Amino acid sequence: MSKRRMKYHSNNEISYYNFLHSMKDKIVTVYRGGPESKKGKLTAVKSDYIALQAEKKIIYYQLEHVKSITEDTNNSTTTIETEEMLDADDFHSLIGHLINQSVQFNQGGPESKKGRLVWLGDDYAALNTNEDGVVYFNIHHIKSISKHEPDLKIEEQTPVGVLEADDLSEVFKSLTHKWVSINRGGPEAIEGILVDNADGHYTIVKNQEVLRIYPFHIKSISLGPKGSYKKEDQKNEQNQEDNNDKDSNSFISSKSYSSSKSSKRSLKSSDDQSSKSGRSSRSKSSSKSSKRSLKSSDYQSSKSGRSSRSKSSSKSSKRSLKSSDYQSSKSSKRSPRSSDYQSSRSPGYSSSIKSSGKQKEDYSYETIVRTIDYHWKRKF
């Protein structure tokens, strides 16, 4: 470059720098449109970047990509709370202040990515993301950077296989003969096998398509197909869920088995108890019936004893009556005979017989027998 042209560029840079300083602490709009367009307070102007205090965060723009900065004269008095701002001499040093923090590269578009900054080379920065794992960004193509709320999922992960190379060319050499993804999206995005060529150029081979690329024009590169890291993570989560489901199912089945065993035991014990209670009730009923039978037998025996005693007593009474009647009848038979015999022997025998003819009829043998029969029948 000629001295005149260098002087022209230096003069333009000085004038542009002075122009930016004149708008410091004013409300401006960076970019007039597109995903990178943001409105806020211009808080810092550095050699190759500016700091814009937006509504919720501070955005650091690399000056070589800023196409326009417009002052908002209508809202020049609007106050925006200023957060703590990083202070660095240049954009590369600014990125170095954000190592191991959650950041966002670019505010929108296909090359916008959020993740944890894990490494910084001379001309690239390595960002650990959820979707693509570690992505290597060419610093020359980063339009803006801002702090982002930490993603717990990313914070808990330890990135594996981070290429800690000095520059982007060494990163490309490490990724040769591997499947890589060039750029995050848009018409320039491509996937394929990276093949090394002479003169610092590389070739991407995908099926029948062969493309020659130069690392300087690559915005970002990552190992493997795009989204493979997220798919692998989802697969691991699904496997984990399946294992948890299996464990829970096995626990439920073992629990149901133990509950069935306990229910069987309880049923068995209830059957034993019922059988025992049945036996006890049967034994009680049998004892009761035996007691009743004993009582009834005792009662019957007592009744039979009473009846036998009553019968025997009645028989004995009958016998006694019969014997008494018989004795009385014998005595009565004998008495008239004896009386007759005595009367016959006495001197007044004939006269007495004549005088007491009626008594002779009353105390005859037949009269006595009839009298006994009458009284016997009447009594029994």
Curated annotation (Swiss-Prot):
Region (Disordered): 224-364
Superkingdom, taxonomy of origin: Bacteria
Annotated Low complexity bias: 275-288, 296-315, 338-356
Segment forming the signal sequence: none
GO biological process, one term: sporulation resulting in formation of a cellular spore
Keyword S-adenosyl-L-methionine tagged: no
Skewed-composition ranges (Basic and acidic residues): 229-248
Keyword Metal-binding: no
Keywords: Sporulation
Annotated protein name in UniProt: Spore coat protein B
